[in-house]
């Protein structure tokens, strides 16, 4: 399929411009948080910038979707109740939205504008879909990687389109991600990446803060590498230990033959779906997210956009048993953990996971 003939042209344009507008807003917020933290006026438990950002982004992106595709449903993280009960918070959210609309007014014809609080509440509440196996809906994570966002580190704006339980389009904006990620210490290149994937077409990289929606033919196609030698492999995993089992992941790397003297340099720790972007662009080979408890289930918006990015760049994604993730099961994935890897190594990774899980405590 050529880059110019895929059936999701309009969807991709709307998703791209909505994510670009939203990403610019989050970049400004994240940078201001870092400045505030440096001045010593941000308390550790102050989550208000995240709350404001989440609400503003969900309103902006949901409005763009409903303006262009009124019959589409949206699975979103927030509802507007807290905002409706706090007029000061609502004023802050509306003010941010109006400001970013003025700064990105060139996008208004495509993604629309919000000018009053009631429209903001309504747009946020469009995200109340339960998803499911039939029909068409979008999955949105407005600020994926909250802790990275607060640190001024990695976070992502993630939007995916799902049809009959299958992801067909994904767009991930990574405001703080540098183009080249070699290790935890070595990052270089342009700051801000936009990663897009369309089913049957491929995965692509472009500069996030470049104005407009470039056609895929002008974007950089990205592909996973096919490394299998343990000395060449790199693993991406989360920063926060509460999100995945780092100790189990260390055992898996040992089982795969990683050299204990170099494994630290071969592991890149990143918050959010940024991990999928680094993997899809061939800068890492394996993504491990082992469950920290037997009952935890992932939310679909945490993985939908990343899932298609990996498949369309030549990789494979599954749960801890290797089974593909099912995005038609409602708002959560009915499976444990997430493993992604290049196709050459995927089965070996799943075998290692299976062996470690058999020999460890039942919770893994």
From Swiss-Prot:
Binding-site list for adenosine 3',5'-bisphosphate: 146, 243, 272, 275, 289, 302
Source taxon at top rank: Eukaryota
Residues binding Mg(2+) 1: 77, 141, 143
Membrane-spanning ranges: none
GO molecular function: 3'(2'),5'-bisphosphate nucleotidase activity; metal ion binding; nucleotide binding
Keywords for this protein: Amino-acid biosynthesis, Hydrolase, Magnesium, Metal-binding, Nucleotide-binding
Entry protein name: 3'(2'),5'-bisphosphate nucleotidase 1
Origin species: Candida albicans (strain WO-1)
């Amino acid at each position: 399929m050529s880059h110019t003939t895929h059936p999701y042209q309009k969807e991709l344009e709307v998703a791209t411009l909505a994510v670009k507008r939203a990403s610019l807003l989050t970049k400004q917020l994240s940078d201001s948080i870092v400045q505030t933290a440096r001045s010593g006026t941000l308390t550790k438990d102050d989550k208000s910038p995240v709350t404001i950002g989440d609400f503003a982004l969900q309103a902006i992106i949901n409005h763009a979707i409903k303006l262009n595709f009124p019959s589409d449903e949206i699975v979103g993280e927030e509802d507007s109740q807290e905002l409706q009960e706090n007029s000061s918070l609502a004023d802050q959210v509306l003010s941010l939205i109006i400001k970013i609309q003025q700064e990105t007014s060139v996008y208004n014809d495509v993604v629309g504008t919000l000018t009053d609080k009631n429209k903001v509440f309504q747009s946020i509440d469009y995200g109340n879909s339960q998803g499911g196996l039939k029909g068409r809906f979008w999955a949105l994570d407005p600020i994926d990687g909250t802790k990275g966002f607060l640190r001024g580190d990695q976070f992502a704006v993630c939007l995916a389109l799902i049809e009959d339980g299958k992801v067909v389009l994904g767009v991930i904006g990574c405001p703080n991600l540098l183009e080249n990620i070699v290790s935890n210490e070595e990052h270089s290149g342009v700051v801000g990446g936009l990663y897009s994937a369309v089913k049957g077409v491929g995965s692509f990289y472009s500069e996030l803060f470049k104005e407009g929606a470039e056609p895929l033919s002008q974007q950089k196609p990205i592909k996973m590498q096919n490394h299998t030698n343990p000395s060449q492999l790199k693993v991406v995993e989360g920063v926060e230990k509460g999100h995945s089992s780092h100790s189990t992941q260390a055992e898996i790397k040992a089982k795969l033959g990683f050299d204990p003297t170099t494994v630290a340099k071969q592991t890149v720790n990143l918050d959010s779906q940024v991990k999928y972007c680094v993997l899809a662009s061939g800068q890492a080979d394996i993504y491990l997210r082992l469950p920290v408890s037997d009952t935890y289930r992932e939310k679909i918006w945490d993985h939908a956009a990343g899932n298609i990015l990996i498949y369309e760049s030549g990789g494979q994604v599954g749960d801890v048993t290797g089974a593909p993730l099912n995005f038609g099961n409602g708002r959560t994935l009915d499976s444990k953990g997430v493993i992604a890897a290049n196709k050459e190594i995927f089965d070996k990774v799943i075998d290692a996971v299976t062996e470690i899980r058999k020999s460890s405590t039942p919770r893994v």
